[in-house]
């Protein structure tokens, strides 16, 4: 198994890509800290993992809180006696415009895309160094590679994630720690459907909900949205020893949108 005996944390693991990743990693032998703000969703993922013979620790956390962003690392490491990887998957789409932006929403976008990953990374580095190395994975986006007129503030934040990953990779490589990002395009998740159904998205592009879902999910050469499992597969590779010389990349998983 590709993550046999590895101990890791997955944030926003209650649904979509995070859920798919946590379940897949456990099937590949990882011991997984399953993190989400939704207690029922955490319990569901842990149950699914354990039903299939895997091991998981459910952690309910609000990652807008600095203490929780640190606690998810220390709690997982204490429970499983170590830490080998973190997938910082949590994010927030933010406002659809740059005009009349509510600054509370702007702050939340930065908190859930940037601030929390800094705090979690800080805590994780101590644990990874104690293990002699490890892997840090971050969810950016194609919006952090090419920008998106649908979500300019989100693009701002995700460009920040990509920049952080590239700089971090150079800084921690000496400690046998790799840092990479996965950059999903439109993926058919609950978050995508909630996002495109928002009134600010519909007014921005002048489409009703169903047309907008098709537009956001059907663009690109492959003509369909991705599946959460397809992103989880890429994440698995980047976290595994198969990617032992892969460091500092931002890997698109987008069906060719950024080709």
Where are these regions (language model features)?
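Residue(s) in the substrate-gating loop at a strand-loop-helix junction
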Residues: 141
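Substrate-binding pocket helix/loop in short-chain dehydrogenase/reductase
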Residues: 97-98, 102-110, 216
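Active-site helix of classical SDR
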Residues: 121, 157, 165
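C-terminal substrate-recognition "lid" of short-chain dehydrogenase/reductases
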Residues: 2, 80, 118, 224-253, ...
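Short, small/polar-rich loop/turn modules that mediate ligand/substrate recognition or access, typified
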Residues: 87, 173, 178, 246-248
């Amino acid at each position: 198994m590709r993550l046999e005996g590895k101990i890791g944390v997955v944030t926003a693991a209650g649904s979509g890509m995070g859920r798919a990743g946590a379940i897949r990693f456990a099937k590949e032998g990882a011991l997984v800290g399953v993190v989400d703000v939704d207690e029922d969703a955490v319990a569901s993922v842990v149950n699914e993992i354990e039903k299939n013979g895997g091991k998981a620790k459910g952690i309910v956390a609000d990652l807008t809180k600095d203490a929780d962003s640190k606690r998810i690392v220390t709690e997982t490491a204490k429970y499983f006696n170590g830490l080998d990887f973190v997938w910082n998957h949590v994010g927030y789409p933010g406002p659809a415009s740059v005009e009349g932006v509510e600054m509370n929403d702007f702050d939340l976008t930065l908190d859930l895309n940037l601030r929390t990953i800094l705090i979690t990374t800080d805590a994780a580095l101590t644990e990874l160094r104690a293990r002699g190395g490890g892997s840090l994975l971050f969810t950016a986006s194609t919006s952090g590679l090419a920008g998106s007129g649908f979500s300019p503030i989100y693009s701002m934040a995700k460009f920040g994630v990509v920049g952080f990953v590239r700089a971090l990779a150079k800084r921690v490589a000496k400690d046998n720690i790799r840092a990479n990002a996965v950059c999903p395009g439109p993926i058919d998740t609950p978050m995508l459907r909630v996002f495109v159904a928002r009134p600010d998205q519909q007014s921005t592009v002048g489409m009703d909900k169903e047309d907008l879902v098709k537009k956001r999910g059907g663009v690109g050469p492959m003509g369909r949205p991705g599946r959460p499992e397809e992103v989880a597969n890429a994440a698995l590779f980047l976290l595994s020893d198969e990617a032992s010389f892969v460091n500092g990349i931002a890997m698109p998983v987008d069906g060719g949108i950024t080709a």
